[in-house]
Swiss-Prot record:
Biased composition (Basic residues): 510-530
PANTHER family cross-referenced by the UniProt entry: RNA HELICASE
Keyword Hydrolase applies: yes
EC annotation from Swiss-Prot or TrEMBL: 3.6.4.13
Entries under InterPro entries matching the protein: DEAD/DEAH_box_helicase_dom, Helicase_ATP-bd, Helicase_C-like, P-loop_NTPase, RNA-helicase_DEAD-box_CS, SPB4-like_CTE
Family matches, as Gene3D superfamilies: P-loop containing nucleotide triphosphate hydrolases
SUPFAM superfamilies referenced in this protein's UniProt entry, alphabetically: P-loop containing nucleoside triphosphate hydrolases
Keywords: ATP-binding, Helicase, Hydrolase, Nucleotide-binding, RNA-binding
Region (Disordered): 508-577
Name of the protein in its database record: Probable ATP-dependent RNA helicase DDX55 homolog
Length: 577
């Protein structure tokens, strides 16, 4: 349904919630949003719901309020779980718990989380020792716990009144389906289920995975049925692939007083560009989070970014959903998201709670069709902007600066290569490959935007004919050292072991060749027959070759002994090899 909720419906909903819940609500919130009234009314009428509502519209309270009332009515035992909320990331779980806590404290209920980043044994111990009334979990971690203690979990969840799937469009990906089936097997079938997302769960079969029955559809839409808030303005900038990094930096520099969130396609990309940007944006607070950060580090970085006035956060999609930082001015997407629906979630980190916000995506020339694709499939219109301060000359100057940064530390050099590889792997899997295929991507330009010194060999690029256009650097990468002395010492050891292994392999091959030739000589009676110059001449040539090869083998063995005794320097080893 698409409507504005009237005063009568809102009043009726308030009456259903009861005084305890309203007391907490009225202290912190001014009024109900449409999605809260519509979804909450259906849930309290004991109907399943599928809710599609824009980011920043109050979806969390849309299930928290009716959930608290349902648990209140159920009169749970102290050790019974009355509600299970599944969310795709630990940050979202943490944020949901923060919304629930004031209501839970008022009603003397205990809310707990189980997410990745914690030990499974610790989670199991919590189930055994604590009375849990509301559980907020990532499906992957809850699945792991069920694998260890299914009977215990099923017993704890026998009183579940409500199952909530937050960011439901993420859960119809293949990796979640097995987890969901196992989780659903542990909770009662006679329960209510709510699916909540900013974008549509597109297939009917997806609803079957979650066990919904005769679900009510709630759709609170903005203009043109867009999933984005009306206060959000979406832009794109067209630029050559090799100027993307320059355009990104110049755009940020023009907005010195703005808080900016930048999305990159992989953990390695975030780590690499954090190293680059901290040397290029020296006057701005810079933060970075990705899926492989530790929980304390991620929490500290998000908190510091939230408290900054003009900070720049570099992130993967861990920041794309549910992270409620209300004053982000600009969201920048360095490249296309893996799924077009994720564009909406990324952009939705700005323009929250009625504030104005802006989102920008960097589009390479060969990716221009994506603008129409977004309009047709996600109902998102993009307006073009220019970044006049970014030029090809500045892009080349930046590339040279990035090369110097890599030369200063081998760790950054290797990180840049891994970041580029993961970027290509991610691009090969996005959902609009028919209009923006990897075959059409300017790979050489993208490599230059990463300032690569060497183009790595990749299976995804094996058939490309244009890679010879890449201008390989004259810098000898093997001479670049780690800034960390421990890493450099370890590299020396590894290189020495490789040299030794190579010489040992050569010696073994030579020994095998000599043995084979000896057997051949024996079978021929000690003489080779020659078609051209006669047996005697051929025999002399064979003996000469054998003598030379034996000398080479002996030299290799002597060299190996010198290396093992440490009598050769690194340069002498390299020159000999």
């Amino acid at each position: 349904m698409t409507s504005k909720v009237g005063a009568v419906a809102t009043k009726t909903y308030r009456e259903k919630l009861g005084p305890e819940i309203l007391e907490v609500f009225d202290k912190s919130y001014k009024s109900f949003t449409d999605v809260q009234v519509l979804a909450g009314t259906h849930l309290l009428n004991l109907s399943d719901v599928v809710v599609e509502s824009p980011t920043g519209s109050g979806k969390t309270l849309a299930f928290v309020l009716p959930m608290m009332r349902m648990i209140q009515n159920a009169r749970l035992q102290p050790n019974e779980i009355g509600a299970l909320i599944l969310s795709p990331s630990r940050e979202l779980c943490s944020q949901i718990v923060n919304v629930i806590k004031p209501f839970a404290e008022k009603m003397k209920l205990n809310v707990e989380t189980v997410t990745g980043g914690q030990k499974v044994d610790k989670n199991i111990k919590m189930f055994k020792n604590k009375d849990i009334n509301i559980l907020v979990a990532t499906p992957g971690r809850l699945f792991q716990i069920i694998q260890h203690e299914k009977t215990m979990i099923a017993r704890a969840m026998k009183g579940v009144q409500l199952l909530v799937i937050d960011e439901a469009d993420r859960f119809n990906e293949i990796q979640f389906e097995d987890h969901m089936r196992e989780i659903l097997s542990c909770i009662p079938k006679q329960r209510r289920t709510g699916l909540f997302s900013a974008t549509q769960v597109k297939e009917e079969d997806d609803l079957m995975v979650f066990g919904l029955r005769n679900a009510k559809q709630v759709k609170v839409s903005q203009e043109r049925n867009s999933a984005a808030p009306s206060t959000l303005k979406n832009y794109f900038v067209e630029c050559p692939a090799d100027e993307k990094t320059s355009v990104c930096l110049e755009f940020i520099r023009q907005r010195t007083d703005k808080k900016v969130l930048i999305f990159f396609p992989s953990c390695n990309s975030v780590r690499y560009f954090h190293k680059i940007f901290e040397r290029c944006l020296t006057k701005r607070p810079l933060f970075a989070v990705h899926g492989k950060c530790s929980n304390p580090h991620r929490a500290a970085q998000i908190k510091a970014f939230s408290e900054s006035t003009n900070g720049v956060m570099i992130s993967t999609d861990v920041m794309a959903r549910g992270i409620d930082i209300t004053d982000i001015d600009w969201v920048i997407q360095y490249d296309l998201p893996k799924h077009s629906s994720w564009f909406v979630h990324r952009a939705g980190r700005t323009a929250r709670c009625g504030r104005d916000g802006n989102a920008l995506i960097l589009i390479a020339t060969e990716q221009l069709a994506y603008v129409s694709f977004l309009d047709n499939h996600e109902k998102v219109k993009l307006e073009e902007v220019k970044v006049p301060t970014s030029t090809s000359r500045k892009a080349e100057e930046l590339r040279q600066k990035m090369i110097k940064i890599q030369v200063s530390d081998r760790a950054i050099l290797e990180l840049g290569t891994r970041a580029f590889v993961s970027h290509i792997e991610s691009y090969a899997k996005h959902d609009c490959h028919l209009i923006c295929s990897l075959d059409d991507l300017n790979v050489v330009g993208l490599a230059n935007s990463y300032a690569l010194l060497r183009l790595p060999k990749m299976r995804e690029l094996a058939q490309r004919k244009d890679l010879n256009q890449f201008d390989r650097s004259d810098i000898e990468t093997s001479e670049i050292k780690y800034a960390d002395p421990k890493l450099e010492a370890n590299r020396d050891t590894v290189m020495k072991e490789k040299h030794e292994k190579k010489i040992e392999t050569l010696a073994a091959k030579e020994k095998k060749r000599r043995e084979k030739e000896a057997r051949k000589m024996k079978r021929a009676g000690g003489r080779f027959k020659s078609r051209a110059t006669g047996a005697n001449a051929e025999e002399k040539r064979a003996k000469k070759r054998k003598s030379e090869e034996e000398d080479d083998a002996q030299n290799d063995i002597r060299l190996l002994k010198k290396i093992k005794r440490g009598k050769l320097s690194k340069k002498e080893i390299k020159d000999v090899l």
